[in-house]
Amino acid sequence: MKKNKPLCVEVFRGSVVENRHFIDVCVCDAEGKVVFAYGDYEETIFPRSAIKPFQTIPLISILNKKNVSQYLKGEEIAIITGSHNGEKKHIETVRKLLEKYQINENLLCCGAHWSLNPSVAEKQMLDIKIPTNMMSNCSGKHAGMLILSKFLGAPLGNYLEQTHVVQQRILGTCELFLGKSIPNANISTDGCGAPTFAGPLGNWARAYALLADTKYLPDEIAKASLALISSVAKNPFYVAGSSRLCSVLNSHFKGDIFGKSGAEGCYGCSFKNLGLGLTLKCRDGSKLGAEVALGYILKE
């Protein structure tokens, strides 16, 4: 086991430490060489929504192959990759995306919830009685899966089944970026109902490094990866939204650093100029712990 001390984020109330969050961190290059780490980088984790770039890449890749990539706008790629707030622009973008490809929004199987942003959620609750699937932070991702189903000539109604060609494409892409196969024991269901995949923390860091240093990827996957990073850098609002770290980070670094959060204290980053990737996981699932740890690492 590759272990050392995890990063520790202390939360104070006055002069007293009220809580401690322990975070495993790995930074490595595109060949998987570890540059530095805190904690156990061999720990198997579900990156949660930090997996979304690798769920988006198969769609961009097939559109490139079919020479229709120009029909997927930058903000559309960003929202497919994102975990959005369900703000007006987010919902409008997902709706127009589905309309463009003549897909009924009732086919979305992402579930419904109020916005991840409390102030946005409060406004939503005043406007409507119950949330809709379009408001789900994952509606963009699910729209992307439906579009991919359509271009593969696959049925749309069961696009979330693990054996569906869309999910098999995504599985293959994740295995490519991880550099290893994913056993059935490491496949489960994410909060939005989509299959999700677990792997060692260090391998997810390698996956993010490959987004920064694409020369080790097949040409079509490298091209799709570059398009994804560029789209998020130019349209950071659509990857998260108002008062969200993902949007702030991607807006500030303009593609030099790409970042994507995941539930239960996960975060992934790629560093374009360094050709490195980072993945971190807060052991107790704290979003606060993960974001403070990320800020510390970026500062260092």
Each language-model region and where it sits:
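Bacterial peptidoglycan biogenesis and beta-lactam-recognition machinery
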Residues: 60-70, 102-106, 153-158, 165-171, ...
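Short Gly/Pro-enriched turn/cap motifs at secondary-structure boundaries
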Residues: 14-17, 135, 256-260
